[in-house]
């Protein structure tokens, strides 16, 4: 078994990752808060597409950007402008090659100009509507393996000694994000969380700075992945008695 990634190692990884920000996204930190992005154009592309080259993003990701479990399409709404921008750039450049329904994304991303990717990323980060959470019971009834929420909570909050660090040490409380490096993963779609954690573990996805997510997911079992996804898919964004959500995901 690999050695546990203790706090000093995690901090070293974070420091190194901060220097590796993608040229397509995090190198544009002068655009943080998205000055220069045309949010109205991003909305148009999201809702209507771009001619015959790019269908409306909402077709798969939903009108509110909350994703669709049935298609394995992730939530994009409010998960972080720099992160979405980086993913679109990586998809366009061939640095991220999804499988399944997401396999069409590199073609669509490449059909967008860099400016249009900025526009779309900015628009989806303005989507702050009521959560449209995964229906875990419906997924279970349909034959999808669902984990144990309390076991997922333990991994997210505390990690497992000798296996994985706490998810919230990077992604913030209940996965509510820590911009600009770490996206919102709380209230993400269940099927997408399972697919991505599996891809990180199997190293079929490899566009993470310094291989951080691959290191974190390496020792996770299928049960661990299902448990984490079960908790995160319905995780509260606020602490008990506090309804204020910090601006952690711009």
Task: Give the location of each predicted region.
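Axial heme c-ligation environment in periplasmic c-type cytochrome domains
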Residues: 69-77, 91-127, 132-140, 178-184, ...
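Stable alpha-helical elements in mature extracytoplasmic
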Residues: 38-41, 53-56, 80, 87, ...
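Bacterial N-terminal signal peptides that target proteins for export
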Residues: 1-13
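Sequence context surrounding c-type heme c attachment/ligation sites in exported
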Residues: 43, 47-58, 85, 157-168, ...
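The feature marks the first
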Residues: 29, 34-94
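N-terminal signal peptide c-region/cleavage motif recognized by signal peptidases
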Residues: 22-24
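Electrostatic cytochrome c docking/interface patches
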Residues: 26-51, 72, 131-160, 249-250
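The canonical Cys-X-X-Cys-His
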Residues: 42, 54-63, 120, 164-174, ...
